[in-house]
Amino acid sequence: MKFLVEFNPPIDMKNDMEKSPELQKIVGEAIERMKPLAAWFTLRYGFFVVDVNSYDELTRKLAPLFHLFKSDPKISPAFGLDEFPKLVATLGEEARKYGY
């Protein structure tokens, strides 16, 4: 299962991280343990795509966002383009059950 994780750390955490090489190291190690498939960072936000086999694994991977980044991440299901045809077919089957 893939998930898109969006987070927005408080400004004081961002400022602290810019000033502290030790905090930068800790955050870098936490991101490595998370093993994101992809990551993007902007001035205000961060985005990760993570692949997990269970929800408890998702919780473990996202723990750094709660504790280090002091943020409440937004978590959305994600899928690759190779999975899109099956997803659309399944949605069509389910829609027909309800007369659409």
Question: Where are the predicted features?
Answer:
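Conserved, structured core segments of small domains
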Residues: M1-Y100
